[in-house]
Amino acid sequence: MGRLVGHTDKTPVSLGLLGAAAFMVIADVRVIDPLLHIIAKEFNVGVGSAAVIVSAYTIPYGLFQLVYGPLGDRIGKLKVITAALTAFAVGTALCAFVSNIALLTLLRFLTGVFAAGIIPVTLAYIGDNFPYTERQAAIGKYLSALVLGQILGGSLGGIFGEYISWRDIFLLFGIVSLAIAGLLWRGTRNFRDGNRSTERFSLATFKPYYQLLTQPTARTVIIAVFIEGFCLMGAFAYCGAFLRDRYGLPYVTIGFMLSSFGLGGLIYSRSVKWLVQRLGEIGLMGVGGWLMCICFLAIALLHNWLLFIPFCALMGLAFYMMHSTLQTQATELAPEARGTAVSLFAFNLFIGQGIGAAVFGRVVDNFGYIPCFIIAGIVLALLATWLFTKGKAEAEVRG
């Protein structure tokens, strides 16, 4: 992918290496999707109850955005990314040795705490090095690594779950993440980030969060990404168990099927410029949300597992159409403190996912998968309509 800017003394590590770190974080999240049914069976709990390991990861991931954003602005974003990835690697590897669901939940919680300091801080770092007109394309390239994590995370989870052991995939991810952290440390140990804030880290550090929320645009972005995380990511966590329970498919097949979501994201990353030119930011959010609704309804109501693959891929494309647009807007909410702005954005995304996974877990255990997917789809359509109409109205006011 090349370096962030043309001068190697300013950016000591490549965007590709930062993308590798992001790949591991996303793969670590998505690997759970095909394994949830296996883990529930091994520890003798329901699928909805086993999903506590999803919430245990995503809720602290969201909460600690509020710490890592300002911390990155003050001590240097690359240092935060390197330290967080190192701790993430250790926590992930230890998941391979748990003896009960409670210990796995605790380790997933700690891993989520450390994972929080990687992707959003990197996005803020990209924001510091690209002008706004080039930023969405740059973020689109960075998203390629995240999409690859989406694709291979689910696939590897299915392969290990079916043929090896779900424990070994965590050990593998931990070792690889530690190696990437070592490469980051080698490139950044003598680097001083010129974009650091000079203010001391204290309770006053969190004041910018309140200031951001006083902005109407910021409130719109934050509310939208919370709903997106709650509905899309919260409900999607149950797709793997749904495929197993409804169709009795092998775990390896389920893993590859879930990976089609990432394929849709890859299509987005390769066509982002064309999509932006054709639809604009407002159109991307509207069309993306409506397509996500259609996909959830199709998965719930069409009784053919082969149809899951194209609709899952379309859902991935639709998700990135909306999410990447919101993400790009988030990088411009506070140009003087992008780490803080992006962290507030990620906080709401993953808090939404954690709460959504818990709520939809209760829905699945008590009413089944179909109501879960229908509710998620309808709410996403309403979100898309709100963003589209609000965006159109604001564009008309601007003239």
Regions found by a protein language model. Name each.
Residues 103, 132, 141-188:
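Helix-loop-helix hairpin linking two adjacent transmembrane segments in secondary transporters
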Residues 87, 91, 102-110, 306-314:
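Paired small-residue
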Residues 2-7, 189-221:
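Juxtamembrane intracellular "pre-TM" segments in multi-pass secondary transporters
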Residues 63-99:
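Conserved MFS/SLC helix-loop-helix module at the cytosolic interface between two early adjacent transmembrane helices
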Residues 65-76, 267-280, 364-365:
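Helix-to-loop junctions at the C-terminal end of transmembrane segments
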Residues 282-326:
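C-terminal transmembrane helical hairpin of 12-TM major facilitator-type secondary transporters
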Residues 44, 76, 97-103, 114, ...:
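Helix-breaking motifs and short loop linkers at transmembrane-helix boundaries and internal kinks
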